[in-house]
């Protein structure tokens, strides 16, 4: 099950210069040296894994697996932005190793504090609820990275204007998917206002999310909300 999301994502996918695929214990990512953060982070979350066994480690640190070196403390300190998790720490609380690895800077992105602690957190909580209801979900999440973004820190970490999530329930008889795109700012409206089709997420990110699925199923999942 843990490799399912990797299969769905990686089939037919290629990495560009300055990008690196990294696989950690509980999640995988595609790191962008240009933007000093992940283009996407992907993981499976099961019902059992929503039961927290470990507390937050808060040991923010560079990712030793990033060959070009990742962002670090100096990029975020005093910037006014939160070190926003892409794969949430709360989704990794089932394992001490997974929890610790969720604090790698390769899993961080500069987020408006009101956004990170507000609607983004609520969406993360909603996804955990879906994992309980549907037994497991496949999650892909990340920033929308473009060439015109402002930057912070010595490593020039890009500040995304938008973030996305794509959630997939691929179990037989219950095949469904939903996407979300949200601005990196304080948001007062309900989560449902930002629900979109996977096709819409693909258009704004340029990522082909479910290339490993059969074409007919991929089209069905991506075109419907």
Regions found by a protein language model. Name each.
Residues 2-3, 19:
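N-terminal capping/interface segment
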Residues 3-13:
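Sec-dependent N-terminal signal peptides
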Residues 14-18:
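Sec/Tat signal peptide C-region and signal peptidase I cleavage site
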Residues 20-82:
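Short, His- and charge-rich active-site/binding loops that engage polyanionic ligands
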Residues 66-225:
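Domain-level detector of nuclease and nuclease-like folds
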């Amino acid at each position: 099950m843990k490799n399912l999301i990797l299969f769905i994502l990686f089939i037919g996918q290629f990495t560009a210069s300055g990008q690196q695929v990294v696989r950690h214990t509980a999640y995988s990512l595609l790191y962008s040296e240009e933007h000093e953060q992940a283009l996407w982070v992907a993981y499976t979350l099961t019902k059992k894994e929503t039961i927290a066994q470990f507390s937050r480690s808060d040991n923010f640190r560079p990712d030793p697996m990033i060959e070009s070196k990742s962002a670090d403390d100096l990029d975020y300190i005093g910037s006014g932005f939160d070190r926003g998790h892409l794969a949430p720490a709360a989704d990794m609380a089932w394992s001490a190793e997974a929890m610790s690895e969720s604090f790698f800077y390769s899993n961080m992105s500069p987020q408006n504090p009101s956004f990170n602690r507000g609607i983004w957190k609520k969406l993360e909580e909603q996804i955990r609820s879906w994992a309980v209801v549907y037994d497991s979900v496949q999650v892909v999440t990340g920033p929308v990275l473009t060439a015109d973004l402002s930057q912070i820190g010595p490593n020039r970490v890009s500040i995304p204007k938008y973030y996305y999530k794509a959630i997939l329930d691929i179990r037989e008889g219950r095949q469904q998917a939903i996407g979300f795109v949200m601005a990196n700012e304080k948001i007062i409206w309900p989560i449902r206002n930002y629900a979109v089709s996977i096709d819409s997420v693909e258009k704004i990110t340029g990522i082909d999310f479910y290339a490993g699925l059969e074409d007919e199923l991929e089209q069905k999942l991506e075109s419907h909300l």
